[in-house]
Amino acid sequence: MKTAVLLLSYGSPEKMSDIDEYLSKIFGGKPVPKGVAEENYRKYEMFGGLSPSNRIIQSIRDRLQKRFDQSGDVDVFTAFKHWYPSIGEVVPDLKGYDNIVSIPLFSFFSENVKASYYKPLAEALEKNDIRTKMEFVNGISNYDLFIPMWIHLIEEKEKGDSFYLFDAHSLPHPENEEDYLFWLRYSTYKITQIMGLRSSDFGFQGGHEGWLGPSIYNVYRKAKEKKIIAVPISFLYDHLEILYDLDYEFRKKIEEDGYSYERVPMPNDSAIFITLLERIVSSSITHLSGELIGNGKEKSENFI
């Protein structure tokens, strides 16, 4: 039985001259607001015109592939929602596989995230007449290694008198995101209990009016401690929302208010994260029970 593993992620431009096309994809071909374009140019210029995210995801793919090379029955692919190779470009390569395991690289179960990746994936599968059993893994926080992975990362920055700010991406339609909130709260609670972190809370970044809150810009003000340690628990790899929005913008603000800032490392292509993905793939293959994909039929989800 041959299985295709599809790692799904947002994608990012490879150089400054790619930014206009990248933003056009995000806005679905509609005009990009001038302020948004200027902000993105400013961000990418700070990092030499390149986010590290595509390189990290390729390394994740390569390292995960090595875990399955000996068996020879699993091939790992990457596809981006807003860059190349796109989901539509990669799906034709999935012909001939008995199973597909699709994993958006996002920590928590989310209706918004699920829809944003599953819809173009299902459309591409139908367009290419691929009718294969598929497991769509909506969130990875319900797997055993998720919490130990974050504990390991936090221990690298653990300092006694600190406020631990667990940071998650805000999402629209909060009425549909009860499970997202549950897994965020549950994971934060388990980590703080196991580690004995006395001062912590969670907040959201990147939101708009009516999205999930509270904002991290409101939460840090609760801290009695003057050292803030950010734990971006809903993210899995370095990209500009981490390197710019947190490490530059947020840091600048809290330092102006007299706080110091540190951030725990991201999972990226670490051995423990690759092991977590390996276990997800192996588990999905073992109990794969999705309906045939095609002609609008539903998929299976691996979710407790």
UniProtKB/Swiss-Prot annotation:
State the EC number(s): 4.98.1.1
GO MF term (any one): ferrochelatase activity
Pfam families in the record: Ferrochelatase
Matches recorded under Gene3D superfamilies = 3.40.50.1400
EC top class, as a word: lyase
Tell me where the transmembrane regions lie.
Answer: none
What's the superkingdom here?
Answer: Archaea
Q: In which pathway does it act?
A: Porphyrin-containing compound metabolism; protoheme biosynthesis; protoheme from protoporphyrin-IX: step 1/1
The family classification in the record reads: Belongs to the ferrochelatase family.
Q: What NCBIfam families does its record include?
A: hemH (TIGR00109)
For this entry, the protein name equals Ferrochelatase
Q: Which organism is it from?
A: Thermoplasma volcanium (strain ATCC 51530 / DSM 4299 / JCM 9571 / NBRC 15438 / GSS1)
